[in-house]
Structure formats: C-alpha cells, structure tokens
C-alpha cells in the first residue's frame, strides 16, 4: 500500500505513521528522518541540505525530492510506503506523481488528519519543546494553511479524512478502518 499522510503540525502524523507502518508492514518515510540520515551519512544530498539549513533557509524541493526518490528505490519500499512530510506543496505532489508514474505506480490513498487549531496549540504546548510557543505554533499553522492545505483539493477522490481529536488508539483504528473500505 502506498500512502501519504497530511494534516497540520501537531495532528499526530508521526505517532500514527509509526502505528500504521507496523500494522501494514510498510516503511514510514519521514522527510525529517531522511534529512538526518543523509546528513549523518555525509551523502551529497545531505551536504546540500546541510548548507541550506546552516544558512537558515528551507531545503529546496529538488534536494528533498531526490532524497525521497532514493528512499523509494530501496528494497523495503517495493511493496508500499507511508510518506510523512512529503509532499508539502503542489509542486512536490507533481514530482511525486512523476516518480511513481516512472515505475507504473500510483498512490493508494492520502490520509488527512483533521484537527482544530486550538487542539493543535494545546497539544504542541504540552509537548514542552523549546521552539513550541503559541506564536511560533500559529505561524506554522498559517504556513500549513497556505502551502500544504491546497493538497487536499489536489488529491480529491483519494483523500480519507480522519478526525484526529480522539485517543491515539481511536485515531489508529479509524485510519485502518478507512483504509479497509
């Protein structure tokens, strides 16, 4: 099964991705993990990403997409994968479609975790991370609304909307049930 996870920061994508990965026996591919792995291994893509990050800039789509492409070519992703953090923009979604088309593949579903902004703020503040203050969180939500939310329309027809305001177990169960239909 080939899946993409969408949802605002704090929706629980990382938590749900791990549970889904285990339940479906497919790798959880997170762009954050890809960046860290490529940087720690000193790959060419990792060096490029590090330069942008050191300068406080966003890593360009091309670098991120190339990391994702390389990861999707690994053996454990042959029977499916769960993408978390990519695509984040329409441009990245187009690139992902091209990557899959080259292999005669397509996404099975796009899971969209829906959660209110107030719940997101509450969750993220309770995590106690240094960079999680209300102003920063609301800025991240604004970026999500502008950049990533348009993907919901892009993937219309493949979207599975999941209410992400319950318990971890309930959300996981709802996701697996939606995928079974």
UniProtKB/Swiss-Prot annotation:
Source organism, top-level taxon: Bacteria
Binding site residues for ATP: 10-15, 127, 166
EC number: 2.7.4.3
Catalytic reaction list: AMP + ATP = 2 ADP
Molecular-function GO term, any one: ATP binding
ATP-binding as UniProt keyword: yes
Pathway assigned to this chain's UniProt record: Purine metabolism; AMP biosynthesis via salvage pathway; AMP from ADP: step 1/1
Keywords: ATP-binding, Cytoplasm, Kinase, Nucleotide biosynthesis, Nucleotide-binding, Transferase
Keyword Transferase in annotation: yes
One of the Pfam families matching this protein, by short name: ADK
InterPro entries in UniProt: Adenyl_kin_sub, Adenylat/UMP-CMP_kin, Adenylat_kinase_CS, P-loop_NTPase
CDD domains xrefs: ADK
Localization: Cytoplasm
Chain intervals for the UniProt region annotation (NMP): 30-59
Domain notes: Consists of three domains, a large central CORE domain and two small peripheral domains, NMPbind and LID, which undergo movements during catalysis. The LID domain closes over the site of phosphoryl transfer upon ATP binding. Assembling and dissambling the active center during each catalytic cycle provides an effective means to prevent ATP hydrolysis.
Alphabetical list of NCBIfam families matching this protein: adk, PRK00279.1-3, PRK14527.1, PRK14528.1, PRK14531.1, PRK14532.1
Subunit structure: Monomer.
Name used for this protein in its record: Adenylate kinase
Gene name of the record: adk
């Amino acid at each position: 099964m080939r899946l993409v996870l969408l949802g605002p920061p704090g929706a629980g994508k990382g938590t749900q991705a791990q549970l889904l990965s285990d339940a479906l026996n497919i790798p959880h591919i997170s762009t954050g993990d890809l960046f860290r792995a490529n940087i720690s291994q000193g790959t060419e893509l990792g060096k490029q990403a590090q330069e942008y990050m050191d300068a406080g800039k966003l890593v360009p789509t091309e670098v991120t997409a190339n990391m994702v492409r390389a990861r999707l070519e690994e053996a454990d992703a042959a029977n499916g994968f769960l993408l978390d953090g990519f695509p984040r923009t329409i441009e990245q979604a187009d690139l992902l479609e091209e990557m899959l088309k080259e292999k005669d593949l397509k996404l099975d579903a796009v899971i969209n975790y829906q959660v209110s902004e107030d719940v997101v703020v509450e969750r993220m503040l309770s995590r106690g991370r240094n960079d999680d203050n209300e102003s920063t969180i609301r800025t991240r939500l604004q970026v999500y609304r502008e950049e990533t939310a348009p993907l919901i329309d892009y993937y219309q027809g493949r979207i599975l909307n999941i209410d992400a305001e319950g318990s971890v177990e309930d959300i996981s169960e709802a996701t697996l049930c939606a995928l079974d239909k």
